[in-house]
Amino acid sequence: MEQQRIEVVGKLGSTYGIRGWLRLYSSTEQAESIFDYQPWFLKIKGQWQPIELESWKFHNHELIVKLKGINEREVAQTLANVEIGVNLSVFPLLDEGDFYWHDLIGCQVVNLQGYAMGVVSEMMETGANDVLVVRASTKDAFGKKERLIPFLYEQVVKRVDLSSKTIEVDWDAGF
């Protein structure tokens, strides 16, 4: 059987009411898009466990969910702050030049002059554009520990090769 690759898409929050409902914090671009990705898995004691969504709704601008088999507040409390994941295979294919953040994290970033600037450790959303957070190697010639490089495809980011986990950028190594 093929190993499942799980990506975190949200987190359960505190309980709501006495019948097992929980607040939900979605990491998807549109909060309610989290419900498009099924089935869900919960990370309990370091292991991904499948869970079935019974119902969801908005309440006072918050998302709340009811999970199948969770009918009491006390049981729901044990799931507070638990991460929600989905199998990567349920994500839609993207257009050319679009990438999922989880695919970019871990990529080596090299500028046009061939200088290895570091490895993408995380991504940031700024409103205007996404930003690569690049952790520099300890032997960085410019003394940098971290670089913030805007993910502007074609302008700054010239090439992304996911097979070799390499991102080529038009960016001065001194920044």
UniProtKB/Swiss-Prot annotation:
GO terms for cellular component: cytoplasm; ribosome. The keyword Kinase does not apply. One of its GO terms (molecular function) is ribosome binding. InterPro entries: PRC_barrel-like_sf (IPR011033), PRC_RimM (IPR056792), RimM (IPR011961), RimM_N (IPR002676), RimM_N_sf (IPR036976), Transl_B-barrel_sf (IPR009000). The keyword Lipid metabolism does not apply. One of its GO terms (biological process) is rRNA processing. Signal peptide: none annotated. Keywords: Chaperone, Cytoplasm, Ribosome biogenesis, rRNA processing. It comes from the Bacteria. SUPFAM superfamilies: PRC-barrel domain, Translation proteins. Residues 96-175 form the PRC barrel domain. It is found in: Cytoplasm. Belongs to the RimM family. The PRC barrel domain binds ribosomal protein uS19. An accessory protein needed during the final step in the assembly of 30S ribosomal subunit, possibly for assembly of the head region. Essential for efficient processing of 16S rRNA. May be needed both before and after RbfA during the maturation of 16S rRNA. It has affinity for free ribosomal 30S subunits but not for 70S ribosomes. Binds ribosomal protein uS19. NCBIfam families: 16S_RimM. PANTHER family: RIBOSOME MATURATION FACTOR RIMM. This is Ribosome maturation factor RimM. It comes from Histophilus somni (strain 129Pt) (Haemophilus somnus). The lineage of its organism: Bacteria, Pseudomonadati, Pseudomonadota, Gammaproteobacteria, Pasteurellales. The gene is rimM.
